[in-house]
A protein has these predicted regions:
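Active-site/ligand-binding-proximal alpha/beta "capping" segment
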Residues: 192-246
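Amphipathic alpha-helical repeat scaffolds
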Residues: 36, 128-136, 249-254
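Short, aromatic/basic amphipathic alpha-helical patches
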Residues: 63-75, 230
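Boundary-proximal intrinsically disordered activation/regulatory segments immediately upstream
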Residues: 1-68, 154-156
Length: 272
């Protein structure tokens, strides 16, 4: 099926702005905006049904290899043409690539994930920095984490700044929002908390030799750390030792170190 290039209307441009700016619109319609030629092309190749429509600048196809133009126009997805200046105003990129897409939010089955014999997940506790969260999603996807659960009052993972920082990883990692730590405990998960404070209740991460079969690693924000509710729910609290005088790591860096180390450990059931 071949797509035709349509001129975008003012009403539809207004709708795109709403999707970009408001979580309420994204939640109601279960969509978000994806920017950049590379992530759009990758999504067309892997999951074309996720795309609602594509918006390009008038000269976009002239700058692309023939195979990219053919892929977009043969996708069956509605393709709109939008003036360069308007598209640049919509874009969250420093330099607009000349293409953005409205995309269906992915849906995941939490029960299927938790039914696996080994669960290695991540819990983000009230994380607010979009770039940090995007990097965490990208890292977790790369390290084959089972899923990411986000606490209430965390930033929306479909915020354009988060989406940009994920570098296309949003469709590779199951994500569940508005999740309390108590709900994960009730599902039989063990919480391992990354604590910013060294105390008698913490151990250095290098001392951990095994992990439970159903482990959730909890990461808090750099400024506040983990909430008391999460710390109290944790079976184990660990620290990432740093050189004296060095400030605490940001959430994305702490998550990367913790996930890399812990994901390579055997499970306790495997050694019993």
């Amino acid at each position: 099926m071949t797509s035709t290039l349509r001129t975008v209307s003012r009403n539809f441009l207004s709708h795109i702005r709403d999707v970009i700016k408001t979580k309420r619109t994204r939640d109601r319609e279960r969509v978000f905006v994806l920017e950049g030629t590379k992530p759009i092309v990758e999504l067309l190749q892997s999951a074309p049904n996720q795309l609602v429509c594509i918006v390009v600048s008038p000269g976009f196809f002239e700058r692309q290899p023939p195979e990219i133009k053919d892929l977009l126009l043969s996708s069956g997805c509605t393709v709109y043409s939008c003036p360069d200046e308007t598209l640049a105003q919509l874009s969250h990129l420093d330099t607009s690539s000349g293409a953005l897409a409205i995309v269906h939010q992915p849906t995941w089955d939490q029960s299927a994930i938790l039914a696996q014999p080994r669960v290695f997940g991540l819990y983000g506790d009230m994380l607010q920095d979009p770039a940090n969260i995007g990097t965490i999603i990208r890292t977790a996807a790369g390290l084959n984490v089972s899923a990411l659960w986000m606490a209430p009052h965390s930033v929306d993972v479909f915020n354009p700044k988060v989406v940009r920082a994920t570098a296309g990883s949003l469709f590779q990692l199951p994500i569940f929002s508005q999740t309390s730590i108590e709900s994960l405990l009730s599902l039989g998960c063990t919480i391992m908390a990354a604590d910013v404070e060294t105390s008698a209740d913490t151990v250095p991460i290098r001392s951990i030799q095994t992990i439970p079969a159903r482990t959730i690693v909890a990461i808090g924000s750099e400024s506040r750390g983990l909430s008391e509710a999460v710390l109290n729910a944790a079976t184990l609290r660990f620290t990432i030792p740093l050189k004296p005088g060095v400030e605490s790591l940001n959430a994305a860096t702490a998550a990367a170190i913790a996930l890399f180390h812990l994901s390579g450990l055997p499970t306790e059931t495997a050694q019993s």
